From Swiss-Prot:
One BP term from GO: central nervous system development
Name of the protein described by the UniProt record: Endophilin-A3
Region of interest: Required for dimerization upon membrane association: 60-87
Positions bearing Phosphoserine: 265
Region of interest: Disordered: 248-271
Gene3D superfamilies in UniProt: Arfaptin homology (AH) domain/BAR domain (1.20.1270.60), SH3 Domains (2.30.30.40)
Keyword Coiled coil (UniProt): yes
Length: 347
């Protein structure tokens, strides 16, 4: 820095110190200028805040945002064109539903519904990706340019104006001690900077409809996202309602105990022509008989009670649910699903 530059910096610092510490008054700018300066300051703050909050709106998870930023930085360093996309919550939920829907199988009503919902969630994630790209290109990038160019340029003019004001005020108070030419130059430079700063702020604020247009584009993108999401969800809701109606019309199956599978050696113990010893009866195995799988306590007249493992002689099949048989000299009816046939009734 030149000697003249050092002197000017000293003058500015001296004047600033005088104003801050001693309470000396500097040159006051007009109210209209100060109002424009205030609006520019607020605009600077709101643009910075909107850029941050819009990113949070599109990508709410800070950990994912940090990871994504790191991965994309590494990709750029490596010269890779393809970047990693933000994992949308709809997509993550859709992946979960698809995974377990497929595990439940095609014969599961719940499983099939999970697959339908999962596929719809994946579609919504794609729509959200489109929103991210659209908003970045049409809203975030223009705002970033506004911050980096227009507002930065205005800030530069205001900073330069403040420096020249301090230099002007310092020299104005020392008229007679400082050459008149230096004072005159300080006045000219101050007025020049004021005019530049004032014009740049005026032009920016007069054209703020451009920012309104950017907001309108952002809202249009958000509306399109919600419209497409609504269509996907409405179609999904119709499918689920149809699935519920279809499931309601299917007759309910009744639970039937399934007999435990046993090997022939476990069932017979000996050849079918031998006699099996049971609790209280010796029954030749060449006549129709069955083995009790569970204890059966008769509740109605005519029913035949027995214990698990008892061998019952079969005399008749009443219908698809009941047998007639004998044990311990007593005869009666008993449910088919309580026994396992050893020697079937003749056809």
């Amino acid at each position: 820095m030149s000697v003249a530059g050092l002197k000017k910096q000293f003058h500015k610092a001296s004047q600033l110190f005088s104003e801050k510490i001693s309470g000396a008054e500097g040159t006051k700018l007009d109210d209209e200028f100060l109002d424009m300066e205030r609006k520019i300051d607020v605009t600077n703050k709101v643009v910075a805040e909107i850029l941050s909050k819009t990113t949070e709106y599109l990508q709410p998870n800070p950990a994912y945002r940090a990871k994504l930023g790191m991965l994309n930085t590494v990709s750029k360093i490596r010269g890779q064109v393809k970047t990693t996309g933000y994992p949308q919550t709809e997509g993550l939920l859709g992946d979960c539903m698809l995974k377990y829907g497929k595990e439940l199988g095609e014969d599961s009503t719940f499983g099939n519904a999970l697959i339908e919902v999962g596929e719809s969630m994946k579609l919504m994630a794609e729509v959200k990706d489109s929103l991210d790209i659209n908003v970045k290109q049409t809203f975030i990038d223009p705002l970033q340019l506004l911050q980096d160019k227009d507002l930065k340029e205005i800030g530069h003019h205001l900073k330069k104006l403040e420096g020249r004001r301090l230099d002007y005020d310092y020299k104005k108070k020392r008229v007679g001690k400082i050459p008149d030419e230096e004072v005159r130059q300080a006045v000219e430079k101050f007025e020049e900077s004021k005019e530049l700063a004032e014009r740049s702020m005026f032009n920016f604020l007069e054209n703020d409809v451009e920012q309104v247009s950017q907001l309108a584009v952002f809202i249009e993108a958000a509306l399109d996202y919600h419209r497409q999401s609504t269509e996907i969800l409405q179609e999904l809701q119709s499918k689920l309602q149809m699935r519920i109606s279809a499931a309601s019309s299917v007759p309910r199956r009744e639970y039937k105990p399934r007999p435990v599978k046993r090997s022939s050696s476990e069932l017979n113990g000996v050849s079918t022509t031998s006699v099996v010893k049971t609790t209280g009866s010796n029954i030749p195995m060449d006549q129709p008989c069955c083995r009790g799988l569970y204890d059966f306590e008769p509740e109605n007249q005519g029913e035949l009670g027995f214990k698990e493992g008892d061998i019952i002689t079969l005399t008749n099949q009443i219908d698809e649910n009941w047998y007639e048989g004998m044990i311990h000299g007593e005869s009666g009816f008993f449910p088919i699903n309580y026994v396992e046939v050893i020697v079937p009734l003749p056809q």
